[in-house]
Amino acid sequence: MFTHLHVHTEFSLLDGACRLDDLVSRAKALGMQSLAITDHGNMYGAVDFYKACKRQGVRPIIGCEVYVAPRTRYDRERVQDKAYNHLILLCENEEGYKNLIAMVSKGYTEGFYFKPRIDRDLLQKHHQGLICLSACLAGEIPQALLERDYDKAKETALWYSDLFGSEHYYLELQDHGIPEQQTVNAGLLRLSRETGIPLVATNDVHYVRREDAKIQQVLICIATNHVLGEDTGLEFHSDQFYLKSEEEMAEIFAAVPQALENTEKIARRCNFDFEFGNTKLPYYETPGGMDHYAYFQKLCREGMVRRYGQHPPKAYVERLEYELNTIQKMGYTDYYLSLIHISEPTRHAQ
């Protein structure tokens, strides 16, 4: 069984041409049990993709193809820092999802420079619960191999393998008939032999069917302000970036069957589910780790003393205790603590 683990939807803006419902329907028609979403630098489509998969009985795998800064996410020198590398991150569990959204968010708020970029510092802090693939030709390792710098490629692969762990990092093979991919794949096979890092086969899906390749070309032209037929510098020079069947992928990677088998191995391990309909209140960190309800009681009673003195009317005390008990029973303690945290600076600024 083969699973597509590198897929760009319409939410890879002006790049991906896969409409969610059509994408999932096609995967279902091809007999696929699981499917990933890995849009460029964002997770805008994650919830809609998840719902579309659930409606059609396909297991959704939530992920992202992130942009990794060449130095740190804070560096913004045009010559050195405009370049960036791709990296695939897939959520294995809820911890992985939380780590992924943390990194993607910081890519925008802290690392944005042409693209929302993360860096190795964020990966070191937020790698738990994630499965990592080395990505396409724009990945750090493929780029090193294309530069004929095998030592750098090996050093990079070992760094990621050490960080994510031997069962959470894979070297990604792709073959769309592009000459550069043959060079990269040969290097990846050698790396796998020498380091023991496992291989995985993907197709970097950007459109649902082969005949949709022209639609994706139109998107690229819009993004780069070109017309069809002009050299945009971003065109794929191939019509093979579609949602291929298991049989097509097996034919392409017949020499490395373990790379196909690993897609299903990874898919089985990705078990994150959204919980819709459940109220999730923010978690408030109390001073010294004090019990949340006890801290909330303390703040409320101190507030009553400030307003009514050390001996407030009995009716006021009883009303406060009633309100406190009600808030605790409803599970809203953290909600009220968060409101206090938000409103206090405003109150003091007046």
Regions found by a protein language model. Give the residues of each.
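Phosphodiester-processing cores and adjacent nucleic acid-binding clamps
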Residues: 1-343, 347
